[in-house]
Amino acid sequence: MRRSPSQELAPGTWAPARRIAERVLGPIERFLHVEAASGVVLLVASAVALAWANSPWGDAYEHLWHVPITLGVGSLAFTQPLHFWINEGLMTIFFFVAGLEIRREIHEGELSDLKRAALPIAAAVGGMIAPALLYLSLNASPASRHGWGVPMATDIAFAVGVLALLGKRVPPALRVLLLALAIIDDIGAIIVIALFYSSGVVWSGLLVAAGGALAVGVLQRFGVRSPAAYVAPGAVVWWGMLRAGVHPTIAGVAIGLLTPVRSWFGSQGFVAAARDAVDRVAALTERDGHRADELLKPLGRIRQAQREALPPVVRLQAALHPWVAYGIMPLFAFANAGVRIDASSLGHAASGTILLGVTLGLVAGKPLGVFLASFAMVRLGVCALPRGVGWRGIAVVGCVAGIGFTMAIFIAGLAFGDAAMLAAAKLGVLLASAVAAVVGLLVGRLALSGAPAPGAALTLAEAEGSTEQ
């Protein structure tokens, strides 16, 4: 039935729909923007922690993280130091967001197609193996070799931040490649943590975690849409992992991977629901003497339709990512980057080789592994370089991938129980990350030109499919 002029949609009526389109079409641009800006916050938090730890008030810094915090009441109370709640509690949310990113990439991103994923997978694997081997070549003793996983990690916030400083020199396809590489690197780090940096498995704990995961699946099956309903079963998964001897942050990854990638509403369902609600708003506003509170229900329906038109994985990532980037990660850096630099803290016999192994692993091993693995895969014909990206661009990605920082510090905390060895590993991470950032900037300025190469992908949308050659 044809609408009368009074029923035609007024300008701005579809503003919610436009906002949804922007959120669906531009997730990578926003992701890169948040990551680049959060790198500055991370840097400030780390600098403050390092300065405080080496000041006359350094003991207060150490004591702060041992303050006991209790959650729960009575027999259900659980008491742990503040440092635990940051590293094992809040970091679970970080790993949950990482799980969401991985889930999206597998469904619709660079990891959804094997040919597109081949290059970033090869680069990431090479960038993990080479640093680990370089570290082990310098740390063969049982006391220090357990830290081989430390130089494998890449901090996506700092890496993307360095690329952002290079401005228009960096082609969009190179940014997408770095993003995909970093996500695969996260997958590798998660596997390493689960397999090599967790204590002996207690099967009863795994059964508890499996029960929590099953509850999540049941809620999804019955169409429960409120995120709050999933907090309790998610906490059960976390508790089960902790009791099982598996690092509890893995629970965040597991729940992230279980998050639905399809929206509750299809596009047609959203249009129908929104149109019906808009028609009701139009009818109410045309009626004399209508009350403002009568608009609450149809406007609420529009908001609900807008919310449910987005897949849960997209909506949760958009909601949590800024909190993780600007809150959890800087807090983690502040709690873990405060390394006291003196003879007593670095006096362990193995400290020197640990520091050297971590530093060289990130600064030299990362770019070498990324470049050689990419070169081998392209020469073997398994994949092709993205449009507009040359070998100089791959070298730049390898350099900035050596910025390990937060994830490397996280693994160091799992690898070393000795305070001096942990301090050496953290210092190596901080030193290597600073050097890798400077080298990445210098190589980027020298190797990348401001003009796009012929046939280069000019937008992120083009860049996402540019490896399908």
UniProtKB/Swiss-Prot annotation:
GO biological process, one term: regulation of pH
Domain of life the protein comes from: Bacteria
Bilayer-crossing regions: 31-51, 82-102, 118-138, 147-167, 176-196, 199-219, 235-255, 319-339, 353-373, 394-414, 423-443
Signal peptide: none
NCBIfam families attached to this UniProt entry: NhaA
HAMAP family on file: NhaA (MF_01844)
Name assigned to this protein: Na(+)/H(+) antiporter NhaA 1
Annotated gene: nhaA1
